[in-house]
Amino acid sequence: MNDIQNREDVALLVNTFYTKVRANDELGPIFNTAIKDWDSHLIHLTNFWESQLFRKNVFSGNPLKKHVEVDKNNNNQITNDLFGLWLQFWLGTIDELFEGQLANLAKDRARNIASFMFMEIFRSRQEK
């Protein structure tokens, strides 16, 4: 098995992962309601992860703001367990497709992002 080597590998990871997320009974309804144009969003997410893994400046956006909005639109029902499920799918998809230094970096970044996002979403709920 190879490591993540280029944008095409990142796109494979992102597309495979979100196919699972969209079909999941718990995560699917949240994502499928929030995202109207999946083709565009998958490109956007590929840009995000390409930026994270290869330090390329191809992503623009504010993921934290978007996730806070999604939580608000779901009556503040996004839980740490849902982030854990998201992370479980991400780590499992990486393990199915890749191994190596960048694969491990993608796992580490996702762990950090999930923790940070949930903490910031929780904090934003306190600001009401």
Give residue spans per PLM region:
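Core of compact, soluble alpha-helical bundle domains
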Residues: 1-128
